[in-house]
Amino acid sequence: MKIAIAQTEICFEEPEKNLRTAESWIEQAAQEGADAIFFPEMSFTGFSMHVEKVAAYVNPIRQTMCRLAAQEHIAIGYGWTSCKSGGKGENHYTILGKSGEVLSDYVKIHPFSYGGEERL
C-alpha cells in the first residue's frame, strides 16, 4: 500500500480555498500511485472560534471529498469542524474509501485546549 501525506497550509475559515488546494494534492497522489492520502486535523475548516460559520460547509466538503475519492480511486482521510447544539464545536476526522463511501467518522472526545477555548 502506498500512502500519501498532505501537510498543507490551512487557510482558516476558508473551506473553499482549502478544498481547491486539496484537489490538486489528491490528483497528484493518485497520479503517483498512492492508495490513500491523509490530510491534517481540521484540514478544510481550520481552527475556528466561529464554528457556526464553518459548519455551513460540512456537506459541500463531504460531497467534494466523496466525489474526488471515487473519481481518483483513492482513499482519503481529512479533518473538519462541526457545530453541535449549544454552539460548541466538534473536531472530526473522516476516512473515505476508494469508491467515495464513508468508512469512519471519528469525533475527538478529549480535545486539546491551549487557550481555554473549551470555556467559550
Label each region the model flagged:
Residues 67, 84-120:
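Active-site catalytic loop in hydrolytic enzyme cores
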Residues 1-5:
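Extreme N-terminal starter segment of soluble prokaryotic enzymes
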Residues 42-59, 85-89:
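Metal-dependent catalytic neighborhoods of phosphoester/phosphodiester hydrolases
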Residues 18, 26-52, 69, 76-77:
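Active-site beta-strand/loop signature of hydrolases that rely on acidic residues for catalysis
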Residues 7-12:
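Short polar catalytic/cofactor-binding loops
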Residues 58-84:
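A short, hydrophobic beta-strand-centered structural micro-motif
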